[in-house]
Amino acid sequence: MIIIAERINGMFTDVKKAIADKNKKVIQDLAKRETDAGASYLDVNVGTAAADQEGTIQWLVETIQETCSTPLCLDSQKPDVIAAGLKVINAENGVLLNSTPLNKKSDEEVFDKYVEMANQAGPKANLIALTMDKNGVPQDTDTRVAIAAEIVSKAMEKGFDTQRLFIDTIVLPVKVPNAQSQPGNILAAMDQIKYLSDPAPHMTIGLSNLSQGASERSLINRVFLAMAISRGLDSAIADVFDQALMNVVATSDLLMDKQIYSDSFLKVYNSVNKG
């Protein structure tokens, strides 16, 4: 399971303040703790913390790389911000570009730009593509699958290996009116997306979005994560500091026959996957 740690994001108060103060220690401590907690990638998102998003993402990347070699996930839907981050990143460790819709009303070719940047960054550069187009986030299963199919088709046309492609089916907050049917629609879409190519694209979600504003956030996230893994999900942007959630990842590996059973399977998983 590929876990993308979510906390280095300017939407969080401590990170926003660290960016404003240029406090490297806060960012570096977060990067170390997320790595130690089992992160495969560290998400790096300026959020609303700075007007100069290009300069800020470069500062974040350089700050993290001073003390940490965990691959980074550059998180912005602005191609110029991603390009700025790529100028200073060590892509040999691996990098994930997060993320592009299929297209936007203001930019029909945005997907092509992200594929080009991923290709230029090297063979260890992967790409997250959203099942979203110029009409926004789809509300039904069939449209999600159709957009995913077009994403896969366009990637293959450009010679982009589908093993480097992550399809994000976009989870919405379950608390939002009329959104409670969406988790079921997403699971049904996952059932089909995993068959769109051979090899199949990865599937990922921004897990914490599901429980935004809700009570029992960790419980909601854990249950849906287990359900989605059973449908083929192999990646999530998530809170690696939620140990109960990480235990779901470990147990899912066991039940999906990716780990040999032992009475100490959680300990074994942690020893292998945590820094």
Language-model regions, residue ranges each:
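Glycine-rich, proline-tolerant flexible connector loops at the mouths of alpha/beta enzymes
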Residues: 35-70, 171-179, 183
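Active-site mouth loops of central-metabolism enzymes
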Residues: 3-29, 53, 98-106, 136-142, ...
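Hydrophobic faces of well-ordered beta-strands that scaffold small-molecule active sites
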Residues: 2-6, 40-44, 70-75, 93-99, ...
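Distinct, well-ordered alpha-helical segments
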Residues: 53-61, 82-89, 114-117, 142-144, ...
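A non-catalytic, amphipathic alpha-helix used as a structural packing/dimerization or gating element
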Residues: 25-33, 37, 146-150
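Gly-rich Lys/Arg/Thr-decorated short loops/hinges at beta-loop-alpha junctions or inter-strand turns
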Residues: 7-16, 35-45, 128-135
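Catalytic alpha/beta core domains of metabolic enzymes, predominantly
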Residues: 106-109, 113, 119-273
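Active-site cofactor/substrate anionic-group-binding motifs, chiefly glycine-
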Residues: 25-26, 57-104, 108
